[in-house]
A protein has these predicted regions:
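First exposed extracellular module after export/assembly in secreted or surface-exposed proteins
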Residues: 25-143
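Positively charged n-region of N-terminal signal peptides that target proteins for export
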Residues: 1-4
Length: 143
């Protein structure tokens, strides 16, 4: 009897610890990249998924490209806004955002070496709630 009670209590506690899928602050997750090695004349497409309880996603997605320092002091890193398409407002909204860059947008500045970059993403909604930071896997940008 005691074991049954403890087992039931454990199941109840574990089921109560589930994180809500839809929250007031947008949730942003990195899903994938179309390539992990970007060469000349190619396009990099990074796919993110989002959820938002109020459905008030604004067009504010901030993208950070982070590259280790080059011997010449330049690193090719940047912080820039990325325009998110308009979504019709709906409760418990979810979807994907695809961020695309051509080779010339992110080309390596550490010549003659290849760059290895990671991309970080932050989404803000119309009520100024900010998502957690989503981080890509390392992307090699060839020279």
């Amino acid at each position: 009897m005691r074991k049954t009670f403890l087992f039931s209590l454990l199941i109840l506690l574990l089921s109560g610890c589930k994180k809500d899928k839809f929250t007031t602050a947008p949730q942003l997750k990195y899903k994938s990249a179309n390539t992990t090695t970007l060469g000349r004349f190619q396009t990099l497409s990074l796919t993110l998924s989002f959820t938002d309880a109020e459905g008030d996603i604004a067009n504010t997605l901030t993208v950070l490209k982070i590259v280790k320092r080059c011997p010449n002091g330049s690193d090719g890193s940047f912080v820039q806004p990325y325009t998110v398409p308009s979504f019709p407002a709906a409760k418990n909204q979810q979807g994907d955002i695809i961020v695309s860059y051509s080779y010339n947008d992110v080309n390596p500045l550490c010549s003659p070496r290849n760059d290895t970059a990671i991309f970080k993403f932050v989404l803000k909604d119309k009520a100024d709630h900010i998502s957690d930071t989503a981080v890509s896997q390392p992307i090699i940008i060839t020279n």
